[in-house]
Each structure stands twice: as C-alpha cells, then as structure tokens.
C-alpha cells in the first residue's frame, strides 16, 4: 500500500520554517505530530530563530489541523512553545497542550495561571484548567489534583488579577459541584459589567444545573449580543425544553442572524431536541449552498440523532423500571396470598435487595 503521507526529512521541515521568503507548506504540518527526541532537539535549537509571526502562524495552523484530525498529537512542539519569549506564542501553546489534558500538566497550567507575566497567557491557562474540573467530576483524575485545581480557580476568581483572568476562572469552575460555586455565579450575574454576566451564563451552562433556567431564559433575546449568545449556548447545554420554541423562532430569521449566534442556535437545538427540531434543521439543510454551513448542520443533525437516541433509551429504561416495580408488587401480593402472612418492611431479604439496588 502506498503511504499517503510519505516521510519528509525533518531537516527539510526546519529549512522551510526558516525560509521567510516562502509560505510554510501545509503538507508539512503533520510532521510535528509525535516528534522523535532527535527531531524535538533539532527544533528546539532553531526555534527562536524562526520569525515570531511564523511561529504563531505555525501553532495556529496545528490547532486548526487538530479539528479535522484528532489522531494527531502536538505535545512536543507545544511543550517547547510554552517557554517562548513571545506571549502570543505561549497562549496558543497552552491551547495546544490542553487538547491532550494529561493530569501531570495541571500543575504547569496552575503555575502559568498565577505567574505568567502576560494577561492573555494567564487567561488561557485558567481556561485550560476547566477541563481538569470536568475530568475530576467524572473521576478521571485523582481527587487530590481536582481539589488543587479547584482551590486555585477559586483563589483566582476571588483574587486581584484582571477581570479577564478572573472571568475565565469563573467559567472554569462552572463544571464544579462544590457549594462555593453557586454564590460566585450569582455574584457575577449581578455584576454591572456585562462581561461578568456573560461569564456567569457560560458557567451556568457548564453546571447543567436547572436552578439557573430562569436566568438563561431571561437572556435568550437580550439586546446585548454577547449575553444572548451565551444564553443560547447555555440553554442547549442545560437541555432547557422551554427554550425550544424560541430557538426555532430565531431560525425563522436565519439570514439575519449573526454567524456565531446562528451556529449556537442550531447546536443548542440539536442538544435539546423535541418536536419540530429535526424537521426545521433538515428543511434548512435543503436551502443551504455554503459548504461550511452544510457541514456544520450535518454535524448538528448527527448530534440531534444522539440526543434523540439518548432520550429514547431513557424512556425505555424508565418503562422497564416501572414494569419491574409493578412485577415486584404483584409478586409480593402473591406471596401474601400464598403465605397468608403480611410482609414486613423490616424483612432481611427485602432490605438486602434494596441495598443492592442502591449500589
């Protein structure tokens, strides 16, 4: 079989990077995935000799490539770029590192979130820590690491850093189930700065907590585009059924919507599902002629199918549970008729079965 990606000598890659007179060939990008130690060392030797904007462009191109090919890993080059003297390079490097959130990296991000000299790098590091809160809630990282990350984020939200960094910290703790999270979100939502309100809505969506439904619904049609956008996204993440008709109504003015808002409405509908959603999205798909919009809508329809299947499975599980409970009641009644003795709720066999169900 012919290899669709022939191995290009890494010296050729480095020469191309250093050649400012020519655009960097996009077909070379994949060579930065899983760098061998020798190649990593060679890249490190010339890294700061590469023009700054070229380094930034390279990392951003690698970031874009990850969206279409998730098998690739750019750990080595992003690790190198974390120590770059240019803040913009470090910012993109943090985002690249966060694509593969190893538990050992949490401490690196915590350190950068606190000590990096640039506000945007700190903000990127704080945002990356949100993934560790999410993983911790799923028991995918150790409780010790989770608590360290949560404590660091709470310290930053309540600290003296810039509003941007503190807002990103609030968004990251949106995943957190600790009781300290709720008052922080409430305080941010009451802030006079709409940036804080937007971050509060973002955190509400991540929490998936129905307590915030009123606040989210109240901002779906906000005159502030940022607040409306975040409320639309939060409605989808929280699967707020009451938002379905209002989001469908928004799609009736598809061409008038901002591109980002349009995308948020479509995706949130795919997360909420329900009557009329599939028909609306499929009808919209037939009207589109832009390839990117078509691809996005097709992905939304795939997600809608997942949503529908999940809800259908939940209905079957509920029906199975109800039938099982009914069978248990019938069996108990038969037992009473056969034994002519009332069953005690203190019966050892019943209690044991109940404990197994709870486990």
Whereabouts are the PLM-identified features?
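Structural detector for internal amphipathic alpha-helices that build alpha-solenoid repeat scaffolds
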Residues: 15-35, 45-48, 56-69, 80, ...
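N-terminal alpha-helical scaffold/docking segments in eukaryotic complex subunits
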Residues: 1-70, 324-359
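Eukaryotic acidic, Ser/Thr-rich intrinsically disordered low-complexity regions
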Residues: 282-359
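A broadly tuned "polar low-complexity/structure-edge" signature
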Residues: 90, 94, 112, 117, ...
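Short, mixed-charge aromatic SLiMs
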Residues: 84, 153-155, 196-197, 293
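Amphipathic alpha-helical scaffolding segments comprising HEAT/armadillo-like alpha-solenoid repeats
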Residues: 2-12, 35-47, 68-83, 102-115, ...
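Short inter-helical turns and helix N-cap capping residues of alpha-solenoid HEAT/ARM repeat scaffolds
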Residues: 21, 50-51, 85-86, 117-118, ...
């Amino acid at each position: 079989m012919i290899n669709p990606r022939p191995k290009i000598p890494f010296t050729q890659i480095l020469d191309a990077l250093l050649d400012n007179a020519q655009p960097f060939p996009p077909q070379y990008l994949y060579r930065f995935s899983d760098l061998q130690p020798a190649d990593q060392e060679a890249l490190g030797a010339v890294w700061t000799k590469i023009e700054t904007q070229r380094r930034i462009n390279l990392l951003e191109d690698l970031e874009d490539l990850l969206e279409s090919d998730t098998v690739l890993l750019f750990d080595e080059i992003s690790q190198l770029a974390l120590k770059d003297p240019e803040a913009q390079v470090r910012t993109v490097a943090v985002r690249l590192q966060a694509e593969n959130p190893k538990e050992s990296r949490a401490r690196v991000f915590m350190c950068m979130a606190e000590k990096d000299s640039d506000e945007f790098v700190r903000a990127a590091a704080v945002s990356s820590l949100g993934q560790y809160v999410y993983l911790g809630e799923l028991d995918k990282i150790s409780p010790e690491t989770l608590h360290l990350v949560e404590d660091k984020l709470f310290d930053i939200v309540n600290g003296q850093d810039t509003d941007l960094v503190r807002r990103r910290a609030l968004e990251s703790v949106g995943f957190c189930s600790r009781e300290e999270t709720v008052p922080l979100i409430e305080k941010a939502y009451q802030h006079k700065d709409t940036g804080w309100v937007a971050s509060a809505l973002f955190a509400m969506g991540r929490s998936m907590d129905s307590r915030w439904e009123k606040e989210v619904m109240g901002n779906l049609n906000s005159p502030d585009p940022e607040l409306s956008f975040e409320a639309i996204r939060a409605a989808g993440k929280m699967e707020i059924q009451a938002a379905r008709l209002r989001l469908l109504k928004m799609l009736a003015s598809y061409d008038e919507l901002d591109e980002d808002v349009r995308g948020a409405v479509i995706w949130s509908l795919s997360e909420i599902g329900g009557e009329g959603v599939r028909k609306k999205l499929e009808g919209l798909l037939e009207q589109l002629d832009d390839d990117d919009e078509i691809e996005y809508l097709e992905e939304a329809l795939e997600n809608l199918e997942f949503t529908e299947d999940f809800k259908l499975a939940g209905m079957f599980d509920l029906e199975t549970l109800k039938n099982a409970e009914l069978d248990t009641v019938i069996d108990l009644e038969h037992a009473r008729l056969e034994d002519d003795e009332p069953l005690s709720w203190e019966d050892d066999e019943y209690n044991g079965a109940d404990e197994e169900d709870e486990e």
